[in-house]
A protein has these predicted regions:
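Bacterial Sec-dependent N-terminal signal peptides
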Residues: 1-26
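A structural signal for beta-strand and strand-to-loop patches characteristic of beta-rich domains
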Residues: 22-386
Length: 386
């Protein structure tokens, strides 16, 4: 479940009156009135830099609902972050009436080479898509205070971010043929030992629901965090990665017990437990083409003689809200018209009769509505004279 909409919907439900009207209607009404988000894009003057260079940038700040220049924020914060995740410099940029701003960073010789990050955000963007990364006491004690540690392990999904290499300055001016990066000074931060193979599973819709058929995506990483291609088995079926360490498979989820997958990597066999099976919830499978997206739903362990809803959000705005009632087997099918959605990523959320999110799924829409129109130029005369 994406954090921004799960948290947003739960906050709305918590504020509903006890003697509620139709909770689905209230959810729909509040989603329609959801605050408009902002988006930022930074245009840099280059794709890579050398120590001693200047990084010039131009910023574009737009409203997420229509991609027009923002009329909300007038201050933009732009940060340069070192390869080890520490803040090098933060700049405050004034956003003009056209949603633009500009500035530059100096890559001083005191910095070391490596992959740097530049990120940009407005204060308003900090209200959306917040994720707290898990951390232990040992890692938090590496910071000067709790606030620094909290900021380091907090991720804002709406922040614009771009990573680029910074190379060592060449020995002779103008000799840029050889680009090299010198390893940064060694730190004494203890490195946690990692398994040689790590596999993470992502059930479609967010959960494995007992007694349903599920599609499960997975990603395989080695001890250095690099994606690797592997083969294995799950529930008697052969599974394998399809591209850059990622793959998917379908599985019949049993009513009881646990599921596991077994992989062979570099001569060693690894067993991984799939996410816990839940007795109550909604299994979601989405099929889509150019015209429509069809959500196949299977609800288990919940009341069936009640209305549920599917909400579709794009650009932070509610684009579709459909009610449905599952059949006697708990199954239902909801069709989304993709022609009515803007190009980009949309989020489909299944909501129960109490207004709580049950499952969600991202899907992509490409309607070519951002393509620039051709301009035709014609003259009113064949010849012109001074």
């Amino acid at each position: 479940m994406t954090n921004k909409f799960k948290l947003f919907i739960m906050m709305m439900v918590a504020s509903l009156p006890a003697a509620a009207q139709d909770k689905l209607s209230l959810i729909e009404s509040r989603l329609e009135k959801a605050p408009v988000q902002e988006k930022v894009y930074l245009h840099l003057d280059n794709n890579c830099y050398y120590k001693g260079d200047d990084i010039w940038y131009k910023a574009y700040v737009v409203r997420a609902d229509d991609n027009m220049y923002t009329d909300m924020s007038r201050l933009l914060y732009v940060e340069l972050v070192s390869p080890d995740g520490m803040l090098v410099e933060r700049q405050t940029v004034v956003v003009n009436a056209n949603g633009n701003g500009e500035g530059s960073f100096v890559l001083t010789d005191s910095l070391y080479s490596g992959f740097y990050e530049i990120r940009a955000y407005t204060r308003w963007m900090m209200n959306f898509c917040v994720t707290e990364h898990p951390s232990n006491r040992q890692s938090r004690e590496l910071f000067y205070n709790r606030q620094m540690a909290s900021d380091f392990f907090r991720l804002y999904g709406t922040v614009h971010s771009r990573v680029f290499p910074v190379y060592e300055r060449p020995d002779e001016k103008g000799e840029y043929a050889q680009k090299y990066i010198v390893n940064r000074p060694k730190s004494r931060i203890p490195k946690e030992l990692q398994e040689r193979l790590r596999v993470t599973f992502y059930p479609e819709g967010g959960h494995l629901i007992a007694g349903t058929k599920a599609t499960v995506a997975f990603e395989a990483l080695d001890e250095e965090g690099q994606q690797v291609d592997i083969k294995g088995t799950a529930a008697g079926k052969t599974i394998a990665t399809e591209h850059e360490g990622r793959g998917r498979f379908t599985i019949d989820v049993p009513d009881n017990g646990n599921l596991k997958a077994t992989f062979l990597f570099e001569g060693k066999e690894y067993d991984f437990k799939l996410p816990n099976i839940e007795r109550f919830g909604c299994a979601l499978h989405l099929t889509d083409d150019k015209q429509k997206a069809v959500a196949q739903l299977h609800i288990r362990g919940a009341q069936l003689n009640a209305d549920y809803a599917v909400a579709v959000l794009s650009q932070g705005v509610l684009k579709d809200f459909q009610r449905f009632r599952p059949d006697s087997k708990g199954q239902a099918e909801v069709t989304i018209n993709k022609g009515e959605l803007p190009s980009g990523v949309s989020d489909l959320i299944v909501i129960d009769p109490e207004g709580q999110p049950m499952a969600d799924r991202l899907f992509f829409v490409r309607n070519f509505d951002y393509e620039q129109q051709l301009i035709t130029v014609s003259a009113d005369s064949i010849d012109y004279s001074p």
